[in-house]
Every structure is written in structure tokens, then in C-alpha cells.
């Protein structure tokens, strides 16, 4: 079973990388600028993908049974995602490149640091012209250790729902092989997603509360597969294949 999963993972990585390569060739030969699906009235301004590795530093996020923190997995996937997107010619920015909080210095309490962290991430995204936000996270549901799979959530900005659905369509055959998941609107309680002006999608790549999935999420090859699928989905959305 493990060998089958690894073979399937490698296959989908290869397919996603091929799609990224073809998209890079197509976009390199095209004179049109990178513009978000749905147009959003942005004209020909070049689009920048802001990749947000959730949590970081003292805020480790969800924790797997073996003690592995979500923040490190988020960063690993995000750095791979950046490489794939840059290979395709897409401009990128990251909210963090190390396992640190993005908060102001000198704050005394964890609550203060978390609030500052979220405010700074939102400001970072809003300062990037013509941005699209991809926020990378891991899920956890200790009360149901069998729950697994990847799911996307979109904010209220134009184009976000179409992007979330495109990403979910790519993730389902790779991660949710037993039961496909549906993308959903982001809850009002998620500060960052509701305080950015850009179309934004939060990607929950898997459940750290599921022992088998947590083990896969820590594997470099699986992280690369997730990044490749997300990158391929973004390129498909940007090319206008899933505008509706």
C-alpha cells in the first residue's frame, strides 16, 4: 500500500511538473501579461502570487502526534511552490522564509505577537500590487483521527472562488483519493483572509491528526507533489481555463 501511494505521488508530481513546463512555454511565447482570472478590472498589470506559509516560530500551529509542528511543513511546501511558480515565469513573494513569526519586536505576550503577526501579513499582501494570496496550512481534528485530505477555502474577492475550485479539482485525485472534498468560503473568523484586498485561497494540505497523512506531509517528495499540484492549478486558473 505504501509503495502504491509513493508511485501515485511520483506520477502526479511528474504530471504537474509537465503542466508547469508547458504553461511556462505557453506564457513565455504569449505577449499578454499575467492577469487574474475574472479580469477584476486590473488591465495588463503583472500579477504577483504572495505565498503565505502559515504560523511560524513560537506559533507552531497544529502539532502531529510525533511533535512535528505545522509551521515547518507549511514553509517547506511554500518554498517548493515558489520554485515551481518562478520556473513558470510567475512573480512571487513570501510572507516569511524562515521559521519565525512575522510580528513586531518587543511584544510581551503570545497574544500580542499573534495579533501583530496577522496584521503584518495582511499589510504585506495589501502592499503588493495586483496580488493573489495563497496561504498554506495544515489541518487537525484530534477528535476524529481518521479524517484526512486537502481542502481549499476562498475569500470574498473576485476570482477567489474560481481559483479555489481549480485548486481543489487538482488536489482531489492526488490527496482525496477515497472521497473528493468541496472548496468552501472562508469563515469570518480567519483574520488574514478577510483583511486582504487580493483574491485569496487558503489551502489546508492535510490533517496532522491523522497519523498516516501526517507522516506523508513530512516527506519531501509528497511536499513537492502538493506544491506542484497547487502551482499547476494556479497556472490553469490564470490561463483562463476555469473562469466560471
Identify the meaning behind each predicted range.
Residues 1-244:
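Catalytic-site microenvironment of enzymes
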Amino acid at each position: 500500500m505504501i509503495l502504491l501511494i509513493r508511485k501515485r505521488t511520483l506520477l502526479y508530481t511528474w504530471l504537474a511538473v509537465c503542466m508547469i513546463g508547458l504553461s511556462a512555454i505557453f506564457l513565455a511565447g504569449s505577449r499578454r501579461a499575467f492577469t487574474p482570472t475574472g479580469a477584476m478590472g486590473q488591465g495588463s498589470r503583472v500579477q504577483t502570487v504572495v505565498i503565505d506559509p502559515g504560523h511560524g516560530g513560537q506559533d507552531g500551529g497544529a502539532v502531529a502526534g510525533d511533535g512535528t509542528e505545522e509551521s515547518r511543513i507549511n514553509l517547506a511546501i511554500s518554498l517548493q511552490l515558489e520554485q515551481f511558480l518562478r520556473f513558470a515565469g510567475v512573480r512571487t513573494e513570501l510572507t516569511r522564509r524562515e521559521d519565525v513569526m512575522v510580528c513586531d519586536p518587543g511584544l510581551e505576550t503570545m497574544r500580542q505577537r499573534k495579533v501583530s503577526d496577522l496584521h503584518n501579513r495582511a499589510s504585506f499582501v495589501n502592499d503588493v500590487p495586483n496580488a493573489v494570496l495563497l496561504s498554506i496550512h495544515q489541518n487537525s481534528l484530534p477528535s476524529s483521527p481518521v479524517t484526512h485530505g486537502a481542502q481549499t477555502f476562498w475569500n470574498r474577492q473576485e476570482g477567489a472562488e474560481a481559483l479555489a475550485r481549480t485548486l481543489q479539482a487538482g488536489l482531489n485525485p492526488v490527496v482525496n483519493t477515497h472521497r473528493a472534498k468541496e472548496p468552501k468560503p472562508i469563515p469570518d473568523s480567519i483574520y488574514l483572509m478577510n483583511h486582504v484586498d487580493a483574491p485569496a485561497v487558503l489551502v489546508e494540505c492535510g490533517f496532522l491528526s491523522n497519523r498516516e497523512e501526517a507522516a506523508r506531509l513530512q516527506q519531501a517528495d509528497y511536499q513537492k507533489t502538493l506544491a506542484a499540484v497547487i502551482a499547476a492549478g494556479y497556472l490553469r486558473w490564470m490561463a483562463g481555463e476555469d473562469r466560471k
